[in-house]
Amino acid sequence: MGETLAQKIICAHLLHGDMTPGSEIALRIDQTLTQDATGTMAYLEFETMGIPRVRTELSVAYVDHNTLQSGFENADDHRYLQTVAKKHGVWFSRPGNGICHQVQLERFGKPGRTLIGSDSHTPTGGGIGMLAFGAGGMDVAVAMGGGAYYITMPKMFKVNLTGTLRPYVTAKDISLELLRILSVKGGVGAIIEWGGPGIAALSVPERATITNMGTELGATTSIFPSDDVTRAFLAAEGREADFIPLASDPDAQYDRVIDIDLNTLQPMIACPHSPDNVVPVETLAGTKVDQVCIGSCTNSSLFDMLKVAALLKGRTIAPGVSLSISPGSKQVLTMLADCGALTDILASGARLLECACGPCIGMGFSPNSGGVSLRTFNRNFLGRSGTKDAQVYLVSPETAVAAALTGTITDPQTLGPMPAVTLPEHFRIDDSAVLPPAPADEADAVEVLRGPNIQPFPQSRPFADTLTAELVLKVGDNITTDHIMPAGAKILPYRSNIPKLSEFCFTVCDPTFPARARAAGDGIIVGGSNYGQGSSREHAALVPMYLGIRCVVAKSFARIHAANLINAGILPLTFENPADYDALQPGARLRIDGIRAGMAAGKLTLTDTAAGKAYSVVCSLTERQQAILLAGGLLNYTKEHAL
């Protein structure tokens, strides 16, 4: 039996384990990336390991999230990242150089390599044929130190594309259509491979849009073959030597195959407040729009921006609409300026923002109260934009432009003929904003600079054999890491300061949570299905750990968050009978006995001591994960088992 493309790359990087779906495997990692919102903690963790220099082929530290610098905290973090990167063998992408996934794709991504990043949209690299995973910062720190990256061997899904996209129908619409089919939970435990005759007409930026939004499906990662399209992109970036052809075997077997006919696809839109709440754009035509944002790691490539400029040329945005443009990288912005496209964008009335994440994470450009905002982003969770009552929709750049021009949600196919847009054969190459690390023989002399907001990494506690704790919070289904640890301009500056950050934990759900969790001493959280979906931010585990949370019991967990809980020393458990969720109420005193033996057996008993009721919970942990929890988290475990 033949192998899928993902199986081939996994096999080439397999250090331990059996490639049977559901079993734990350990992978050798070639490249890592961090961004500044999660990177400061990742490098603090790396420093505690005492390893002088990274052991990957390539590691890059990006600054693209906390770029407002409204106080000293962001600037101090950037200075810390620049100096710690220089000292330990990491390349540093300066603020303004671009969004990590866009720059990584342009300048560093290589087909067939493995990549993990402390950002959940790291699978963007699958657009160039990489096996790329989002992960918590602790896992990235271990990989930088030469350690393996552990995952559960995924199932293999295949999406076959046939036909050709019609004008105004885009890669974003393909992503939204798959979300409509599968939901935000439909890709959990799977790698999604894209193939079929329809992929031949998709450029690397379009493919990267699709693999980027595989994260919203809950997929482990997504990947395209490396083919002539890939070669052309690498050649345009002056990196054709990095090209290798990669494809699945003709007789490869998949656990599920999904067919999408591009000929019948139409412009799609994800309605508030979930990326899978998808309908055709035409069904919402006429809805008033207040704001349009074009950019993010999903839709900020040169190809996207050239299409936006072509549609805006000679036109003016509607008086009641505010339009922002965030190019994905300095390369994109410079080339837009070179060809005159930037002038067309600005002449339309658009506002040019920095080459950064910006509005996607609530870092500026928040909508008006109750406003309707159309965004080319990948998430529209409640409050993520920075405005709690805003209605955020996810669309393609073409649909975004149509709304900006008309002032209402509009099917872009009504705009007339789509202007022809082609990518140049060669892109402008300027890597001056990517700073190299110090040579190994000069690294000792580099001083790592730390501002007063950068606090030491919090210490977790090993597990005793019995846990007695208060149920301090009960939440529902699809709780995101934005619910657990909000982002935005007011909170992100404290990502290096866990004590300060803890003041905001779960306040979206319950403003009293931080104080009650501290008062409880040891605490337990109960959640519904898909607990912890969304961003890979490990702060959504580290901060609850700091507040005394020892265990989370849920109907099911998102993959990255479950790993982050274990890394932080928090025990993730699932209900054997999901109906037991309804019986547990906040304030209950809960006890778990025989933790060590129960971990090994895969089942524990959760007892409500006042009610005298016992509930069976499942403990799906590998031996390694059990050892991590018993040690009090991954850093303690790593120190005990030197890399």
Positions of PLM-derived features:
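Fe-S-dependent hydro-lyases/dehydratases of central metabolism
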Residues: 1-643
